[in-house]
């Protein structure tokens, strides 16, 4: 919103006197909201953002600029951006009707220009961003990013912010190796499993992580160790 003021001056008989100052508030007719379709993120995900612009006035708003900060935050002496705009993903809908692809500068920041909002109507902008290596992976982390709408005769800029939390969960991968690769009858084989957790929370006993390995032909005299410690054999 914008505040304006006014003061009158009265001149008479060679003298001057000023009135009191009156203040008014210019109400903005444009509102903006921003939401993410996905409820959480992990590194490498694509997030879909929906920006809705609603014009409650009686005059169309034209040639607006929408700027997304792509979640930039201070790091060292500069700024890093955890989101990367996905090329050609931006779409615009006016009253639910698809429009021509908007002019986009990928940034950062992401800048979308030439946006129009009809009188008494709404415009929806949809675009995607890739969660990159600068997205904080630690548990309870978030990506907070803001869009700012300017131009089109607006008295002041309009902003809308969305916060997406990290997915607090383990992420396991397993790799299997065999040594030696070539064997003869009755020769011992060593199978090695490497399990890695790239998530942000540990795997605990209640997660019931189980390795199942089916041998064909069936092997005998099995010995299982975990980090050098023998495990109970169950065959």
Predicted feature locations:
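Exported/extracytosolic protein signature
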Residues: 1-235
């Amino acid at each position: 919103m914008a505040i304006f003021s006014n003061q009158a001056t009265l001149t008479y008989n060679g003298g001057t006197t000023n009135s009191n100052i009156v203040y008014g508030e210019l109400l903005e007719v444009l509102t903006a909201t921003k939401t993410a379709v996905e409820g959480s993120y992990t590194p490498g995900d694509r997030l879909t953002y929906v920006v809705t612009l609603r014009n409650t006035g009686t005059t169309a708003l034209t040639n607006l600029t929408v700027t997304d900060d792509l979640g930039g935050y201070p790091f060292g002496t500069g700024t890093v951006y955890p989101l990367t705009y996905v090329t050609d993903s931006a779409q615009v809908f006016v009253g639910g009707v698809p429009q021509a692809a908007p002019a986009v500068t990928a940034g950062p920041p992401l800048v979308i220009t030439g946006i129009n909002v009809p009188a008494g109507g709404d415009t929806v902008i949809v675009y995607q961003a890739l969660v990159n290596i600068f997205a904080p992976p630690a548990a309870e982390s978030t990506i907070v990013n803001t869009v700012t709408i300017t131009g089109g005769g607006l008295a002041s800029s309009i902003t809308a912010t969305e916060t997406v939390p990290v997915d607090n969960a383990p992420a396991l991968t397993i790799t299997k190796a065999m040594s030696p690769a070539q064997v003869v009858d009755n020769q011992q084989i060593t199978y090695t499993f490497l399990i890695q957790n790239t998530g942000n929370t540990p795997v605990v006993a209640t997660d019931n992580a189980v390795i199942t390995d089916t041998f064909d032909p069936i092997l005998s005299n099995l010995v299982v160790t975990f980090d050098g410690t023998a495990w109970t054999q169950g065959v």
